[in-house]
């Protein structure tokens, strides 16, 4: 289960931010 506003994909939670990021950068950002 993910927090409200977050989406789940393959067991991971993620959130779409206004700024675009590559997946690698997003992982480091988190």
Curated annotation (Swiss-Prot):
Location(s), subcellular: Secreted
Protein name according to UniProt: Snaclec carinactivase-1 regulatory subunit 17 kDa chain
C-type lectin domain residues: 1-30
MF GO annotations: peptidase activator activity; toxin activity
Disulfide bonds: 2-13
One term under GO cellular component: extracellular region
Assigned keywords, A-Z: Blood coagulation cascade activating toxin, Calcium, Cell adhesion impairing toxin, Disulfide bond, Hemostasis impairing toxin, Prothrombin activator, Secreted, Toxin
Coarse class of the protein's main subcellular location: secreted
Annotated tissue distribution: Expressed by the venom gland.
Subunit structure: Heterodimer of a metalloproteinase subunit and a regulatory subunit comprising two polypeptides disulfide-linked (14 kDa and 17 kDa chains).
Family note: Belongs to the snaclec family.
Functional description taken from the UniProt entry: Calcium-dependent prothrombin activator. This protein may activate prothrombin via recognition by the regulatory subunit of the calcium ion bound conformation of its gamma-carboxyglutamic acid (GLA) domain, and the subsequent conversion of prothrombin to active thrombin is catalyzed by the catalytic subunit.
Biotechnological exploitation: Used for quantification of normal prothrombin (CA-1 method).
């Amino acid at each position: 289960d993910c927090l409200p506003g977050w989406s789940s994909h393959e067991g991971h939670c993620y959130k779409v931010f206004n700024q675009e990021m590559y997946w690698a950068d997003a992982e480091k950002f988190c």
